[in-house]
Amino acid sequence: MKEGIFRYRIITNLNCNMNESTGHNGNCYFCYQKFKSPLYLDYNKLESTLKKVGVLKRATVMGGESLLNKDIVKIVSLISKYTSDGVCLVTNGILLNEDIITALKGAGLTEVAISVSSPQQYMRRRDIALTCKRIIPNTRINIPKCIESLNPTLLESVLIDGFYCIVCEDLQARYGDLQLPVGSIKTGDDGYGFYDYEWDGHKFGVFGNYGKYNKSDIIITPLGNFCDWEKYCKAVDNTSLVRQNSKIDNEQIVH
């Protein structure tokens, strides 16, 4: 389902990405997180910042594995009160189950993006992904360009199962071009490196690069190594981030 999907790379002062945790339950080498240690966004500070920002157009909860946070339903419920067009969760899907999906939908979650990077990984998560799509219809599959995902059979399997899929560029373009299924036709270009494709009647999207977005983009992360989150926090007088790793020092944080 492309209609209404938030392309989480496209972020303005009306859209917001919320990286609630750098905790992880995998070792995905394509992950942009420089520090893979337990760092959790403070709920009260999140609420304080949202009150200062006001209503966002759309919010994406991502970074590390958000489902590791025991308060994720509470977090989504809070965020949903400050968005007009919905909330998206990006997850590797390992911790998804029908109960948590139902609870998140009740809290206001409207979109789910499940990241998979190999045919074997997709088959392990296929059943819960289909369950998620049944409960939250706007569920898609994200395929990052990495060594395991270069074979087009992964994308073909996902599309045949009826998922809308986005092929995500590695943040530093380290892994080359994904081989798209034979017969894929490019049908659109948004002018910012996102391309629409169609294969055998199935639609999917491909991210090209990240080079055309400027410093006004807001991506909330508890660490600040990915963008200007700490600058943004300072601008709204909210600088208290929860850090549980003493090895992280200010020289490694974006200022």
Q: Where are each of the predicted segments found?
A:
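Secreted/processed peptides and extracellular or luminal domains of membrane proteins
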Residues: 22, 34-37, 153-156, 164, ...
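Catalytic cores of alpha/beta
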Residues: 100, 147-162
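Short, well-ordered alpha-helical microsegments
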Residues: 69-72, 96-99, 150-152
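Core AdoMet radical
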Residues: 33-41, 56-69, 80, 84-96, ...
